[in-house]
Design a protein with these regions (language model features):
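A generic structural signal for tightly packed, nonpolar segments enriched in small/aliphatic residues
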Residues: 168-461
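Short amphipathic alpha-helical segment within the helicase RecA-like ATPase core
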Residues: 1-229
Length: 461
């Protein structure tokens, strides 16, 4: 079902949102029949609770939605999204009860509640639609929901149907819809074009490694998005154990997130010059796999000692970042499912990001909170630079000891960005482990909404 609001002309059932403190006053102000109906029910205005109130004719007079308490709402996002699937099929409109500051988040939650990944199995949701609440920008929220759906679809698709070939096809599809241009460097041509790390990581796979380069827009500040596109990660010769390989279809989550964000930017026609760089590879095992102790030379000229072939994401990103940096963009952003250490540090819900700009970090943090896309700043901690310097080469792709793994990975990437005016790196999870309001189990966007909200401030749009 498209994640869109119902037409304003459609007949609809009013929705009344009540928090725990407002229920009694509202109920006491109703006609006797309604008051008795609510009193005899189990409706307490608990968060996400729903009660349909009938009219004298037995039709739906209204729907009550519980908004719980402020303390309960703070413990999650999209508090009313789950209520959607408790409603009978039909069209609804918000009549009263939501604070103006909460309208955008809850309206977006209603849209996202309609997401279902049905490529391999039909899982129809109830046909429930909402009209856009007064004061909400319907077009913007629908664009955001569509971008999130693209990200989720890409991450949810298994590697058998989402290898480098298919990820490239997804980029072409997106570019065609928005009149963007795509260039792709594939296989041995990567060496000709001086992208050796991307080639080294992906050369062992049946589908050739590639660098996907998409451009859109001709005027305005320059924004370059770099997304890790490791379509499946076996770990390479440092083979992952089985339980660690189970979710590796999502190792292209960085690419999926930058494509979702790119779609939002283009659909909203933001006045900027956009470039999207995706190194698309599969980290496979074969006779020509890159090896532990190999020393590889990057596009930038920095040499890298390979101390773990399972730390491949930073390698492919390094070449892509170096390429993007050559154009001196106003803002460069990398997104990657890069380290397990980031999950240990902040868990699966928060998207940690790194930047040297305090002003940029503040804007991102405020923006993330405003659009229910929580992000958390982590430090580019300069004293740890020595940890990524092995002695035999310029850089170590997997420092021994395991301390500060997300930070050292971010420091590694920063070595390849020198000319961009500002740089931000996101170390994301891109996965929802269990279903939550507005977030079905599976692929997840982390960071794009915060970035979209922040871009007008960061780039003076």
């Amino acid at each position: 079902m498209p994640l869109i609001f119902a037409k304003a002309t459609k007949t609809s059932i009013p929705v009344i949102v009540l928090d725990s403190s407002a229920l009694e006053d509202w109920r006491d102000a109703q006609p006797t029949r309604v008051r008795n109906w609510v009193t005899s029910s189990t409706f307490t205005a608990a968060l996400g609770q729903v009660l349909m109130v009938p009219s004298d004719l037995g039709e739906h007079l209204c729907a009550l939605m519980g908004y719980g308490s402020a303390s309960k709402r703070k413990r999650g996002r999209f508090a009313l999204a789950d209520a959607v699937n408790k409603l009978p099929e039909g069209c609804y409109h918000l009549q009263q009860g939501l604070p103006e500051a909460d309208l955008d988040e809850q309206a977006l939650g209603w849209l996202l509640a309609g997401y279902s990944f049905e490529k391999y199995r039909k899982c129809p949701l109830p046909a429930v639609q909402f009209k856009v609440p007064k004061g909400v920008n319907a077009v913007r929220l629908e664009v955001i929901a569509a971008g999130e759906a693209l990200t989720r679809d890409l991450v949810n698709t298994p590697a058998s149907d989402m290898g480098p070939d298919q990820l490239e096809a997804a980029c072409h599809d997106l570019a065609e819809r928005f009149d963007a241009q795509v260039d792709v460097i594939t296989g041995a041509a990567l060496l000709v074009h001086n992208l050796p790390l991307i080639h080294a990581v992906g050369r062992a796979a049946d589908q050739q490694p590639r660098l996907i380069d998409m451009r859109w827009g001709t005027q305005g500040p320059t924004l370059t998005l770099v997304g890790k596109g490791v379509c499946f990660d076996t770990g390479g010769l440092n083979l992952k154990p089985g339980n660690s390989m189970g979710l590796m279809k999502k190792d292209m989550g960085g690419a999926a997130n930058v494509l979702g964000l790119a779609q939002m930017i283009m659909a909203l026609d933001l006045p900027l010059c956009l470039r999207v760089l995706i190194p698309a590879v599969e980290n496979a095992v074969s006779s020509n796999s890159f090896r532990p102790q190999d020393i590889l030379t990057s596009r930038k000229g920095l040499t890298v000692e390979i101390n773990n072939t399972d730390a491949e994401g930073r390698l492919v990103l390094a070449d892509a970042l170096a390429l993007g940096d050559e154009e001196r963009p106003d803002l460069m952003i990398s997104m990657a499912t890069l380290t397990g250490a980031a999950r240990v540090a902040v868990g699966p819900d928060l998207a940690p990001f790194y930047t040297d700009s305090d002003a940029l970090a503040q804007v991102l943090s405020i923006s993330g909170a405003r659009v229910a896309d929580p992000v958390w700043r982590m430090p580019f901690w300069d004293p740890y630079e020595s940890l990524i310097e092995p002695g035999i080469a310029d850089l170590d792709n997997a420092p021994a000891g395991g301390f500060a793994g997300s930070i050292t990975a971010a420091l590694f990437l920063r070595r390849f960005v020198e000319q961009a005016k500002d740089y931000v790196h996101f170390d994301i999870y891109s996965w929802q482990r269990t279903a939550a309001p507005g977030r079905s189990k599976g692929g997840l966007g982390q960071g794009p909404r915060a970035l979209l909200e922040a871009l007008p401030h960061l780039l003076a749009l």
